Amino acid sequence: FLVYDPENPRWEGRDRFFLDPGHMSPMLYSTLALTGKFTLDELKEFRQWGSPTPGHPEVDIMRGIENTSGPLGQGHTFAVGAAIAAKFLKARFDEVMNQTIYAYISDGGIQEEISQGSGRIAGALGLDNLIMFYDSNDIQLSTETKDVTVEDTAMKYEAWGWNVLSINGNDP
């Protein structure tokens, strides 16, 4: 569903996908491999020193990686910034720059204050060109999320002005 030009990965009008939890890089690399951006041999080098497939992705526009992952919440913030920039470009150049920005975030990342601020500003600005996939599996690095937070994330985002759609990702 991403609009992009495989012959011109740097095309400014492309949709963008930002991965917040870098540990989900196998998902990203395998998807990009299906588009020819990585070979099976490169996937086999996952997390090896000097590999093109490190444990946390590093920006490589030519291969479809829009952001280097680092502190949790950073990918969420990159996506919000890109959505703001895309809105500016669309206002200036109309449909030529009609981009959709996608982000994949996780329970651990959503707890970070940088992510909270991004969520608030995106809702306040009404960024309808930003779609965020939130992996709400109630697990973070070393514990269940209920051990550190009791908030209803969907309600919080709705209060910030987001259109929230809840999907049971475990429904066979």
Question: What are the language-model segments listed below?
Answer:
Residues 21, 105-106, 134-136, 168-169:
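Glycine-rich, histidine-containing beta strand-loop boundary motifs that form or position
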Residues 91-97, 145-171:
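Conserved thiamine diphosphate
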Residues 1-125:
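Cofactor-binding active-site loop characterized by glycine-rich and histidine/acidic residues
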Residues 38-42, 149, 172:
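General structural signal for secondary-structure boundaries
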Residues 112, 122-149:
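A short, conserved beta-to-alpha structural element at the edge of catalytic cores
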Residues 56-65, 97-101, 131-141, 153-162:
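Gly-rich Lys/Arg/Thr-decorated short loops/hinges at beta-loop-alpha junctions or inter-strand turns
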